[in-house]
C-alpha cells in the first residue's frame, strides 16, 4: 500500500453485530462509608460479586437490548475477558453512537449495589471507528449516562493524563500493528512499562476505577457513513427558525461523461475488434458468476458491459443469451438490430430460458417471437405444465393477436385437453378489466379455429367439439345455483345433504341424465353423462363444497369431483400445477416420491372444481385410530414387517411425507393443520387447501414445514432408520429441485401480472421469497446440512401444536 493510500471500510456496509471484549476492572473498590456519603458501600466481610452491564445508545436514545457479563468474585483486578455481542449491527450506527458501561455488585443482599459507570463514543473526532483496547475511567456511584453529550465520559480529560496514559495509548497502537515491532527493544519497554505502572499507582493511590475494553479490529479502518443518499439537502438553521429545502436538480441523473464513455465502448464500430476478443481468466470467472445468477437478479452496469464486450465469444454458450439480451440498450435502433441478428445465430436455448424471454422484462416483439419458436419444440405434456403461465404472459404482449396467442391456439387444435384448459384459463381472465379485450381476442381466435376443424375419428366435428366445451360452463352455472340453495338450508350438514339429493331428484333432475355427454372440465378426455344423486354429498366446512359422482359411458363407470363456490381456487390451481411440475422433475431424475397432484380447475374468481381423492384427514385418523400406524395396519397388515405394515405401504408413506415437506417449504405454503393433510389407504400423504403461499400464514410462528410428531412416530421415531431414510429423501429432492430453480422462478415471474391475491399484493417480494428458499448461495453438501436442520426445527416446534389444539376445538363446534 502506497504512503499516500488510505484503505477503509464504510460502516454502512458492515452487516455484522457490534462486538467487543470486556477485559477487566482495574483499581480498588471503595470501602464502606456512611449511607449518605454518595458512595456505594461494600461490606468488608463480604466478597464482591460484580457484573458489567453494556448498553448501546444512538443519538442519546437506547438502541437494542443491554447485555451483561457473568459474575466475578475474585480480584482485584477483576478479569472477565468476555466477548459481548450486541443485537445491533455496525451498519445501524450513527456518528454519535456510544457504549454505556455500568458495574454492579450483587453481594449487598436483595438490592444491587452501583459501583459506577462510564460511556465511550464508538467513532472518534475523525469519524473513524475506535478499535483496540480502551481504558475507561468509572464515575463512581453513577450509572452510565447514555445521553448526548454524556455526563459520565470514560475518556480521561487531557489535563489529567499522565505518563501512564500516554504509554498506554502508544501500547494500543503497537498492538494494532501501527508501531514497528523490535524484539529486544520490546522486552525492555514492557519491563519499563510495569515499573511506571507501579509508580503511577503509588502516586495517585486507589482513587479511580478503570474498565478496560477491547473493540473489534478490522483489516482496514472503518469510516462512518450513513446508508443511502439523502435526496433532501437542508440548509443550516438560521435566525428565522424555518426549514429550507434545497433541491439538487442533478441528483439522481446519469453522468454525461460516463454515458459518453459507455457509448464509445459499445459503439458498433468496435464490432470488428470485439469479434476476436477472448476473456481473460478473471473475466471468464466473472462471466460464469453472472451466468449463474437467478433470472430475478438485476445486472450491474459493469456486468452488462462485460457481457456486451464478449458477446461474440459467448454465442456458443446457450445460457448466456438471456443475460446478453438484458444488456442490450433497446432504445438504440442499431444496437437492437445487431442484438437480434446475434440472437438467431446463438446456440439454441432451452425451453426454460424461453419462458424468461416472455417475462415483462423483454418487450421486443422479435425476442418474444424467438421465444415462441423455442416453445414449439416442447411436447404436449411439457406444454401443459406451463400453459397457465403462458396464458398469463399474454398480458405482456404488445398486440392482441400476438405470436404467443396464435401458437397456443394452434397447439390447442391438436390436443383436446390443451383446448379445454386454454379455454378455461382465458375465460377466467375475462374478469380482468384492464386486459379483458386481450383475453377475449384469444378466446375468439380459439373459437374460430376449433369450429373450422373437420370431423375426427369419432365423427365429432369442430362445431360439436366447441359446443361440448361450452356446455361445461352451463354445468358450472347450475352447480353454483345448487350450492346457493343448499347453503340457505338451516340445520346441520345432514339436512343440507338431504336438500342436495332432493334437488337432484326433483327440480334439477335433468342433471342426473344429460341430453348429450359433456367433457369433464377436469379431464376433457373423459365424457360424463349425469350426476348420481344417491352418491352425492357435501363437506362439513364453512363453504359446504359439493362432492359429486358423475356417470361415464363405460358400464358402471363413474368419476368423482368436488365443486366449490365462494373460494378463489386460482391459487390452489397454481400450487397443484407446481406440485405436478415438481413431481415430473423428480421422476426425470429417477426419484418417485409418490406425490398426489390431483386436478384443480378454477372456473371463476370464486368457484372451481377439484378432483376427489378417496382419503381421510390426519385429524380424523388420529381421532378414530389414535395413530397413523394403526390406520395403515388396518388396510395393509403384515405381521412380519416393521410396525405391522407392508414394506410397500410404509415406503409410500415415507416418500410422500418427504416430497410434500420439500415442496410446501419451497412454495412457502401456510395455514397447515391436521385437517388439510390427507392420507389415502395405500399410504400416500398429500396436502390440500392452499389459501396462503409464498410465506404468508395466518398463524403466528409457523414452522418451516408441516411435520407433526405423529408423522415422525409413524416412521418409528426420530432415531429409527426409516426417519433417516425420510430425511435422505428430503435432501435428495431438495437438491434436485434446486437444479430447476430458474424454471420455477421464471414461471412465477410470468404470474407477476396475475390478480391472484398472494401474488398481486407484492409480486416482486413473493418471487424474492421463493428465490430465497432455494438457497442458491450454497452448494449441494451445505444444503443437505441446512435442510436437515430445518427438519429438526420443524419437528421440535411447540407453538404449532398449541395452534393445532385450538383448531380442533373450532372444528368441533362448527
Swiss-Prot record:
PROSITE patterns: C2_PI3K (PS51547), PI3_4_KINASE_1 (PS00915), PI3_4_KINASE_2 (PS00916), PI3_4_KINASE_3 (PS50290), PIK_HELICAL (PS51545). Residues 274-449 form the PIK helical domain. Pfam families: PI3_PI4_kinase, PI3K_C2, PI3Ka. CDD domains: C2_PI3K_class_III, PI3Ka_III, PI3Kc_III. Residues 25-177 form the C2 PI3K-type domain. This is Phosphatidylinositol 3-kinase VPS34. One of its GO terms (biological process) is regulation of proline metabolic process. Belongs to the PI3/PI4-kinase family. Gene3D superfamilies: C2 domain (2.60.40.150), Phosphatidylinositol 3-/4-kinase, catalytic domain (1.10.1070.11), Phosphatidylinositol 3-kinase Catalytic Subunit, Chain A, domain 4 (3.30.1010.10), Phosphatidylinositol 3-kinase, accessory domain (PIK) (1.25.40.70). Disulfide bonds: none annotated. The gene is VPS34. SMART domains: PI3K_C2, PI3Ka, PI3Kc. Residues 538-544 are annotated as: G-loop. Keywords: ATP-binding, Kinase, Nucleotide-binding, Transferase. Its EC number is 2.7.1.137. The PI3K inhibitor LY294002 affects phosphatidylinositol 3-phosphate (PI3P) levels and triggers a decrease in proline, hydrophobic and aromatic amino acids, and sugars (e.g. raffinose) accumulation in response to salt treatment correlated with lower P5CS1 expression and higher ProDH1 expression, genes involved in proline biosynthesis and catabolism, respectively. Residues 687-708 are annotated as: Activation loop. Residues 532-799 form the PI3K/PI4K catalytic domain. Disruption phenotype: Homozygous mutants are lethal. In hemizygous mutants, increased expression of ProDH1. Reduced proline accumulation in response to salt (NaCl). Interacts with VPS15. Component of a complex made of VPS38/USL1 and PI3K main subunits such as VPS15, ATG6/VPS30 and VPS34. Binds directly to VPS38/USL1. Induction: Induced by salicylic acid (SA) and upon infection by the incompatible bacterial pathogen Pseudomonas syringae pv tomato DC3000 (avrRpt2). GO terms for cellular component: phosphatidylinositol 3-kinase complex. It comes from the Eukaryota. It comes from Arabidopsis thaliana. It is an enzyme of class 2 (transferase).
